[in-house]
Amino acid sequence: MRIRTCAAFLLLASIDGSAQVPPPADVDPVVARIVASVDEPRVAAIVKSLADFGTRQLYSDTTSATYGIGAAREWIRQQFVAAGPRLQVSFDTYQVAAQGGRLPRDVELRNVVAVLPGKSPRRIYVTGHYDSVARRTDGQGGTTGFDWTRADNDAPGANDDGSGTTVVLEAARVLAASGVDFDATLVFVAFAGEEQGLVGATLHVSRAKQEGWRIDAVLNNDIVGGSHGGAGVSDAGQVRIFSEGPEDSPSRQIARYVRRQAARYQPGHAVTLVARADRFGRGGDHTPFNQQGIAAVRLSEARENYARQHSVDDTPEGVDAAYLTRNVRVNVAALASLALAPSAPRVTDDDGVPRLTRGASGYDAQLAWAPVAGAAGYRVFWRHAWVPDWEHEVTVGSVTEATLPGVSIDDVVVGVAAVGPTGHESLTSVYVMPERKLKEIRTR
């Protein structure tokens, strides 16, 4: 199929390098209904309940019904169960050996998992960590640092990461209660051991690789509830999304997708793309996924308050329930849209070479892709190579090739997404320029 030149194509002449959020497309009333069902009072109540366990440190009490990590994980499990019979709820349990540092002795670690089966086995994750930690206090208003051998001091962890766990629990509730039969399988995970070095997530990813699970996307939420930063700046109008490079990696495609769906279903609440794996020098439970080749992103609040983090002051008073609710809705919009969409198309040949050429004229962008089961059509995206997000798009029919007249593949990046019969689009598959291998030149 050859696409006729239209006004959208002519916009390439005016590219100035600034990122533009794509204009919202048609809103699916089904997804809009699910997003709207996120409940702010319930969000606030979940944060408070998690903080009320006193501490959720990995080595804290496992026998009490009201205090420590044992009580917290059982409560989380019960919340998943209460969300409805469609969810398959379990503990993802590991016996972790003592290895010094943050793991001073043997410990049983339990991630809490709920699975909402879809029509296909491909998985989409939303995650947060439910464990907490706090520096020890000196009794005089100061702190003495971390003591990883002890777990008896308060660590309410309302924002870090009670907020992310709240995203997971509320997303599970509204998506399970929606009655929608999603194409993809949705997985909700509250990880443990994040504060000990991403332990629960690392073990879970290893299991996923061993089991051969296909995981298309991971949305990790860590510190997403505060709108008042430690530097005195407040910002309740945006959330940051961190994604692993390089520029057109699968992780970056997830970030762009979340931003696009947020503009559609949560207008006025910006998703800010941050082109790095995490905050400087930091990491999160998305990190092990990316390290194992599974595309993942991290969502975090716009303005952090470092004084509250890992302290007895990380209480519900530092969480803005209205702001956190909007961040839950951003997650739900992306999860529902992606789970209703087909798989992303394959844009390389059997040798891994991108199916993108200059066409017969030598000056057009000619692209091809493999057909996707369940796709009703495809959407082609392109942008100037220096710009972080898609600037132009055109929807094509049920075809497997297209030509963009006058579009130079030297100057733009091109991608294609599959569109389902209800209009939901997949992640975008990008035509990435192959790496040139260093050639060894022999001399005499």
Positions of the model-derived regions?
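Beta-strand-rich modules
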Residues: 404-425
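Conserved aromatic anchor
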Residues: 363-374
